[in-house]
Structures are given as structure tokens and as C-alpha cells.
């Protein structure tokens, strides 16, 4: 900084505070005397020196500085120098999340050192200013989250640029012409950084790795979403070649070593567009009157050897990714859709949990075994639902079909087996909720797309009894497998296993939920045992079911819940009310399930406990990849939402407020469930304050209020596909009306002048 800027008479306290913060942050280990500070910052006048001393004293009170002597200070490193993850936001509200904490700390752009979203950084706290939020300053970028980025190319004569969303880079990436790889303006491209910025205003330099194609093409846009999150949009040829060499033949040795379930009624029940069938159910009546139910899971670990090229690719991916119009599988297509998939009328290898259940669905005994099965029928959820309802089931009531009689036999192919499975599943479900499981039945947005991937309709999809039938038996199998390894005699250490864990809700977020639902006339307990909290949540879900605010309350309630994740350190699963729970039932699309299969086999053969540290690292990786896959899925939904509304500009719709922020209102259209934002700048009738605690905006002058859940009328104002952003405007009776100020009379003008004089007089005192 120049002398004039640092030592000039016009420098105020805020400016000098910022200069001192930066000065100490750049010299973390040094003790600095007043003399050195004044000389380095060119503070030549007595008032500036005195102001600097006062500021440093305040910084010491804030623990930003440590006082070494009467005339020297140093940065308080023991308190201030920390590490964490940087979070970049498009609106400029960047933050850093310290390691081991959840609450973000604001970082202004000038203090970010050009850190990118997800980068690991070293940072220091800035001294708090009066009435100012806690701030941090990035001092060092420890590790970049990634080095490849997706954007739109702009190719000029001498240089090219990659235009990226503002939440990725503050500046575009410069690409030398020789590194463009034939890309043209408006091509979507993947670019690798070859030179990182070393200053706030310097753009990064990159090279094109892959040209995805022209923007706007459906395949290009979906692949862009995958590439943006570092997810693979191509399957490596060498991995596919390895998969093509795997034989799907079942050998005589396989038949000898496995239980044979080929003659027992078995079926798969899946979504209508499913191709990878990784679970099947079998059922038969035992001589003692009980039911034998088999939960049969594709035996992926039989075909995918640990450490093989296919396994390494599966570890890297960790999960299949489900975008609106496509699935990006964890395993090569030959394995996931053919060899491993439990296709009808084909003999398949499975890993099975075989239960003996009485008529109350109580487990009398079980065994976990390798099997050979042959599915008799591939059912779609809709087909099973139709069969259940044709035999007297009323969806959502929890009641099974009436008993079969000679006069009223069950209708439909395999009706007895499917209705019995449904009846047992409903008993299991009732017992689970009685035990304290939390009931969330939030609807999911789905799109129907044409052959070009363009959305033609969108709708909410709700889980029905047919879905719940399958879900309950999968939950039972997962819990049973976890108990078989984790539940040991007191004093004995269980062998290593990846668990699916879910911690208790955050008490503070539960209190926020309580305050929110009170406005709709509901109550919730935030204190007491886990069971009491769960029962209270379930009552809330039951009370608001079918009401306009149902989805909204479910959304806010979900925010109060902790995220489920994988870990070898078991703490139970709050949402399901299980002490032991794992993922065993989907090895085609989830890598943790494959890990569990391998460990079960190892332990069944008398193997020693697996390396805990190694499996915990794998669990963390799988949890991270699950979150990344969910983010990509959400982005594909946002893109299709904007695309669907793109030809409806200017049209008006009824909507409900689904989110309130300091920068605008989120609204969901009642008719098609598409969500957009009404920017704060467009609500022009007043200046609105954001009341975070009460989820509302309140006008300062006219006291108009916009509350979460309010019914409003909106107009589609803008549909920006590149940003995946829908902008709405308030319309009809909801539109803001700017109230004109009454003309000021002469006397009122005098009063105004008099008040201004009084204010100026007070200011000058």
C-alpha cells in the first residue's frame, strides 16, 4: 500500500483496523513494537499513532492480539490461527467452517485469497468491529478441493476464457489459445487449472481437458452437472473390458455351496424404469403355520474381487448417481443390469437373510446364507399397489387386506403371497413406530421427459403401501445383519463393520422447529428421552398430514435432523429407532453394502476383525460421495425445472412461500411444484427486514408481512438455464403496491428542517 493511503489524514478507524488486521495476519509469529508498526505502515501523525494504539488495545481485548509488553503486540496464534473448509457463495457471503465445528464464519471476498468452494484453508479471526458479525481472514490455502472445472467457453483471437458460475470463481479462467483443444465459443468444457492465482485480482490459468459440446443440448448439460461435481460421465474402457470378461455362469461348485431357493416363490418389486434389480423377496408357509420370508440380495462380491480394477472404480464412485433422465451406475452395465441383476426367470446368485416370522411378524429365527434363486416375476410398484387395492387395501391407513374367504377369494396372480407380505410388512412398520421410529413421508418431485430429454410434465411422487412393503423387509434385513455382528456379549468387542448411523436431532434446531409449528397451531416436545421426541415428531407429522403446510413442516423438521452417514463407530440410528443398523441390501448401487457382504463372508469363515481405520476412511469417503451425488441430483432437478418453465414467461400461478431469506422469497407453484425466487429488490413497496427466527419478512414502514407457508400469486419473470435459476415476481393481489408519500405542507417542511438542525446540533456536541 502507498504512503498516502496508509498514513493519510483521511484514514478512519475502520480503515486503519483493516490495515492492522492484515499487517498482523501476514506476520503470525512476530512480536511487533509500536515503532516498527508506525514505520511499516507510515503512520506519521500523532492522531493516527494514538488511534492505532487504541485499536490494538481493542484487538487485545478481542483476543485477536496478545500484548507482549507496554509497547508491543503479536498475533494471538494459540486462539486465532485455525484450519477449516472454505464455502464460496454466489451472493458473496463466503464463509469458513472450522474443523470439528458446524457454524460458518463470514469471510469477505477481499479476505478470501481466492479460495474456492471446498478448499482447506488456514485462517485467523478478525477483531470484531462494533455491531459487526464475527469475521475471518484466509491466510493460506492448504489444499485445493479440486483442479478441474466446468463452464462455457468464450474464444477470442488471442485468448480463451472459461466462464464459470460466480460461486466457483470470482474471475473467469484464462486459457491460452494453444490449450483450447478445438473448443468454440459457447461450448461447454472441462478445464484443468495449470496456474493458480497468487493474488486477489489475478485470474487462474487453465487448459481444456474435454469438450462436452454446445450449451443447451440435454446430454451436454447433464454431463456438465456430473463434471461440475467431479463425478464420472464416462465409464473407463479398461474397466468395461474387465467386466466383459466376467462369466455369468453358475458352476456346480456354486450350487453345492449355496442354499437352493429356485423352487420357492420369489419376486422383485421396483420402479417402472428400473434395470438393476438388487433385491428380491421370497415367501412360503411353513408346516408350523409360520412364514418363511427370504430377503435376497444380488451377490456382487462374488463377481467383484476386492482390489480388482472394477472394485477400484466402484470405490472411487461409491454410489450410483440418479439424475432426472439417467442413471450413472457404480458398476459397469454388464454387471449391474445383467450378471448381478436379479432378472426374472434367470438363475442368480444371492446373499440372503432368511426369516421365520409368525403371524404378528415377530422374528422367531433367522439365518444369513449364500443362495441360488430364480425370480418368478418382476413387478412394478404400481402393479403391486393395484393388486393390493383390488383386494380391499386402502392406501396409507396401515390396514392390511381383509382375510380371504371362499366367497371372496383374493384376485390377481400371486395375490396370496403379495398380500401376506404386505400384512407382515405392516406389522413390522407398526412395531417400528411404536419403538420410536420417526415418520417422514415427504413427497419427491419427478419429471416425465420426451426422447430428447425435455420435461413434458412434473409431479410429486408419494411412497405408497407397495413401496413400504419392500422398505420394511429391507430395513429388517439391514438391522438383522448389523445385530449379527455388532450385538455381542458384555465386555466383548464386536468385529469391525460399517454401520449406517444417525445421531439425535440438534436441540437448538428442534427448538426452532417448535417455534415454527406453533404458528400453524401445532405443538412439539423438545426435551425428554429419544422416544418422547420421536413420538412428538410423529404426532406432528400425523396432525399436519394432508394439510397445505404438510410439505413445508416436513422440510423444516428434516432440517432439525442430523445427516445419516457411514461409520465403524456405532451410535445407533435415531430416525429408525434401531440400536444397530447397516446397509446390506443394495450392493449394485452402494459400495458400503459390498463392504458389508465381504466382511460377513470373512467372519462366517472365522476371519479376524478387519482394520478399523481403513474401513472408517472408506466410510467417510462413501458418506462424502453420497452427499455429492445428492447435490448433482438436485442440480439436475433445478435444470429441468427451469427448462420446464422456460416457455411460461409472463404466466401467473398460485403458489406458497417455501423459503424466506435475507435476499428474497422462495415460492413453490401449487400446480406443478416448481420453485423459484422473488428477489428482495423486486418487492419495492417497502424496505423489508428478515426475521430469521420467525421465518418471515416484515416491512419497516407499512408492516406488511411475508411468512413461510403463505399463499401468494406469482408471475414467471425469468428462466435462466445457465444459472439453473427461476425468478418470479409477485402478481395479482400479492403484488406490492408502492404507497405514495403525501405532499409535505410548508409547516411540515419547517418541522423537518427543525429536526435536521436538532440532529446536526446533537452530532456536533
Question: Which residue ranges define each predicted feature?
Answer:
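Acidic, low-complexity intrinsically disordered tails
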Residues: 1-14, 687-696, 731-765
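Charge-lined substrate channels and their catalytic hotspots, especially those that engage the 3′ end
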Residues: 2-294, 301-347, 378, 385-386, ...
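Electropositive polyanion-binding surfaces
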Residues: 39, 190, 195-197, 214, ...
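Residue-level marker of beta-strand positions
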Residues: 64, 120, 188, 362, ...
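A short macromolecule-binding patch
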Residues: 103-108, 169-175, 673-690
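Intrinsically disordered, low-complexity linker and terminal regions at domain boundaries
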Residues: 119, 679-722, 726, 738-743, ...
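Short, surface-exposed secondary-structure boundary micro-motifs
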Residues: 126, 194, 658, 717-719
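Internal insertion modules embedded within essential enzymes
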Residues: 151, 201, 717-731
Amino acid at each position: 500500500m502507498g504512503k498516502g493511503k496508509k498514513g493519510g489524514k483521511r484514514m478512519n478507524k475502520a480503515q486503519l483496523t483493516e490495515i492492522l488486521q492484515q499487517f498482523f495476519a501476514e506476520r503470525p509469529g512476530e512480536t511487533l513494537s509500536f515503532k516498527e508498526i508506525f514505520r511499516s505502515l507510515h503512520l506519521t501523525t500523532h492522531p493516527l499513532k494514538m488511534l492505532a494504539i487504541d485499536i490494538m488495545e481493542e484487538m487485545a481485548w478481542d483476543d485477536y492480539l496478545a500484548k507482549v509488553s507496554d509497547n508491543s503486540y503479536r498475533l494471538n496464534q494459540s486462539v486465532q490461527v485455525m484450519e477449516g473448509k472454505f464455502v464460496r457463495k454466489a451472493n458473496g457471503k463466503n464463509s469458513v467452517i472450522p474443523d470439528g465445528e458446524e457454524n460458518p464464519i463470514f469471510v469477505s471476498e477481499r479476505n478470501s485469497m481466492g479460495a474456492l468452494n471446498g478448499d482447506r484453508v488456514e485462517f485467523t479471526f478478525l477483531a470484531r468491529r462494533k455491531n459487526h458479525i464475527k469475521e475471518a481472514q484466509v491466510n493460506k490455502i492448504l489444499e485445493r478441493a479440486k483442479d478441474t472445472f466446468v463452464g462455457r467457453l468464450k474464444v477470442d483471437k488471442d485468448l480463451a476464457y472459461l466462464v464459470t458460475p460466480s460461486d466457483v470463481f470470482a474471475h473467469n479462467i484464462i486459457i491460452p489459445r494453444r490449450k483450447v483443444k478445438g473448443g468454440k465459443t459457447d461450448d461447454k468444457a472441462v478445464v484443468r487449472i495449470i496456474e493458480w492465482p497468487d493474488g486477489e485480482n489475478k485470474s487462474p490459468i487453465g487448459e481444456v481437458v474435454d469438450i462436452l459440446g454446445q450449451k443447451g443440448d440435454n446430454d451436454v448439460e447433464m454431463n456438465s452437472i456430473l463434471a461440475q461435481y467431479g463425478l464420472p460421465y464416462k465409464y473407463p474402457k479398461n474397466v468395461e473390458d474387465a467386466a466383459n470378461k466376467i462369466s455369468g455362469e453358475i458352476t456346480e461348485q456354486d450350487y453345492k455351496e449355496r442354499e437352493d431357493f429356485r423352487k420357492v416363490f420369489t419376486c422383485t418389486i421396483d420402479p417402472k424404469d428400473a434395470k438393476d434389480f438388487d433385491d428380491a423377496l421370497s415367501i412360503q408357509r411353513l408346516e408350523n403355520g409360520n412364514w418363511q420370508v427370504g430377503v435376497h440380495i444380488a451377490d456382487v462380491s462374488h463377481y467383484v474381487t476386492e482390489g480388482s480394477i472394477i472394485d477400484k472404480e466402484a470405490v472411487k464412485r461409491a454410489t450410483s448417481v440418479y439424475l432426472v433422465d439417467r442413471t450413472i451406475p457404480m458398476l459397469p452395465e454388464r454387471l449391474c443390469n445383467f450378471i448381478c441383476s436379479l432378472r426374472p426367470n434367470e438363475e442368480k446368485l444371492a446373499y440372503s437373510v432368511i426369516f421365520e416370522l409368525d403371524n404378528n411378524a415377530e422374528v422367531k429365527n433367522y439365518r444369513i446364507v449364500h443362495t441360488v434363486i430364480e425370480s418368478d416375476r418382476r413387478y412394478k410398484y404400481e402393479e403391486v399397489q393395484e393388486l393390493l387395492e383390488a383386494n380391499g387395501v386402502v392406501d396409507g391407513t396401515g390396514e392390511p387386506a381383509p382375510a380371504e374367504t371362499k366367497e371372496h377369494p383374493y384376485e390377481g396372480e400371486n395375490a396370496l403371497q403379495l398380500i401376506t407380505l404386505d400384512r407382515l410388512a405392516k406389522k413390522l412398520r407398526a412395531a417400528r413406530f411404536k419403538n420410536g421410529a420417526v415418520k417422514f413421508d415427504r413427497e419427491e418431485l419427478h419429471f416425465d421427459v420426451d426422447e430428447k430429454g425435455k420435461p413434458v410434465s412434473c409431479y410429486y411422487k408419494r411412497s405408497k403401501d407397495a413401496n413400504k412393503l419392500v422398505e420394511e423387509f429391507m430395513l429388517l434385513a439391514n438391522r438383522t445383519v448389523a445385530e449379527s455382528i455388532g450385538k455381542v456379549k458384555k465386555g466383548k468387542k464386536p468385529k469391525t463393520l460399517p454401520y449406517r448411523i444417525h445421531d439425535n436431532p440438534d436441540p437448538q434446531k428442534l427448538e426452532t422447529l417448535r417455534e415454527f409449528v406453533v404458528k400453524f397451531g401445532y405443538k412439539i416436545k423438545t426435551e425428554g428421552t429419544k422416544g418422547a421426541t420421536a413420538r412428538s415428531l410423529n404426532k406432528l407429522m400425523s396432525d399436519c398430514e394432508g394439510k397445505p403446510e404438510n410439505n413445508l413442516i416436513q422440510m423444516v423438521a428434516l432440517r432439525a435432523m442430523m445427516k445419516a452417514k457411514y461409520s465403524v463407530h456405532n451410535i445407533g440410528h435415531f430416525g429408525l429407532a434401531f440400536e444397530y443398523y447397516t446397509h446390506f441390501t443394495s450392493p449394485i448401487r452402494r459400495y458400503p453394502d459390498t463392504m458389508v457382504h465381504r466382511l460377513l463372508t470373512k467372519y462366517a469363515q472365522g476371519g479376524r476383525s478387519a482394520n478399523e481405520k481403513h474401513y472408517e476412511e472408506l466410510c467417510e469417503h462413501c458418506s462424502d460421495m453420497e452427499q455429492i451425488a445428492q447435490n448433482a441430483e438436485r442440480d439436475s432437478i433445478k435444470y429441468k425445472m427451469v427448462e420446464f418453465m422456460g416457455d411460461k414467461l409472463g404466466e401467473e400461478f398460485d403458489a406458497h412461500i417455501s423459503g424466506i431469506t435475507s435476499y428474497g422469497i422462495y415460492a413453490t407453484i401449487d400446480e406443478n411444484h416448481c420453485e423459484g425466487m422473488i428477489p428482495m429488490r423486486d418487492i419495492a413497496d417497502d424496505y423489508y427486514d428478515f426475521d430469521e427466527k420467525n421465518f418471515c419478512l416484515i416491512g419497516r414502514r407499512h408492516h406488511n408481512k411475508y411468512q413461510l407457508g403463505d399463499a401468494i400469486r406469482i408471475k414467471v419473470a425469468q428462466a435462466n438455464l445457465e444459472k439453473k435459476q427461476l425468478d418470479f415476481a409477485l402478481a395479482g393481489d400479492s403484488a406490492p403496491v408502492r404507497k405514495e408519500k403525501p405532499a409535505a405542507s410548508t409547516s411540515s417542511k419547517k418541522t423537518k428542517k427543525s429536526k435536521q438542525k436538532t440532529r446536526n446540533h446533537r452530532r456536533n456536541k
